[in-house]
């Protein structure tokens, strides 16, 4: 049991923070950490799913998969399976990654929409595809980071690996396509460039740089992407890192939060995403 966890909310955001428990358990052997890890694993075993097995984002967001959710759950599940020799998780992880790619990928832009509603009933959902209407950079960054992170815990060869490599290379191509040429970083709404109100956003840019660097280092994408990764890293420092008078540093232009549906007018529109609060040193 995790004392403050609202288990029956089936909030997939609960899972990601559990990754730190593996280190605590390894270093201390304290069984309480194992109980907490098992609790998170149990949530995923019981998580409501779409008809094709995709995790709902939360119980209050029925029939919906968001790109965010792949990052929140899949790396944890992959590490759990690796540490505790639970190979049953591998096929599930591959299904999550490939399913949301099929449902949210837009071949016209080379990008992935933020969310998908299987029921196609949400106010933000396209009535034909179920997709949300725009490309939120941080959600794409979360998805990209998740895909390269899960491979750390998967067997060297597994069924579906070629499909995952295709997704990684598709992500890299789309991300670099929309890299802002002067600064090397990325916009809050990925494909809207200099549209009035759009802004360069630090958390998404950081995730994109992380993904590109790791994918190049692991050999998942061609080494030619290294130049884009370096431009992005240098851009992060120049655009977003601010030294304070006391010698500390802050990261600027962090979108506080964005989602779909629920409370407020979270309709996935361009106006919604650019209207999200900006924080410093928070994402």
Functional labels for PLM-detected ranges:
Residues 279-283:
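Conserved small/polar residues in nucleotide/adenosyl-binding loops
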Residues 80-88, 150-161, 218-222:
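Inter-helical turn/loop segments and adjacent helix faces that build the functional surface
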Residues 144, 150-190:
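Oxyanion-binding "anion nests"
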Residues 1-7, 35-54, 90-123, 165-183, ...:
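Long, well-ordered core segments of solenoidal/helical folds
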Residues 15-24, 55-69, 110-136, 183-204, ...:
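Carbohydrate-binding/catalytic loop surfaces
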Residues 20, 29-72:
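Extracytoplasmic mature domains of secreted/periplasmic and thylakoid-lumen proteins
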Residues 201-218:
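Internal helical hairpin/lid segments
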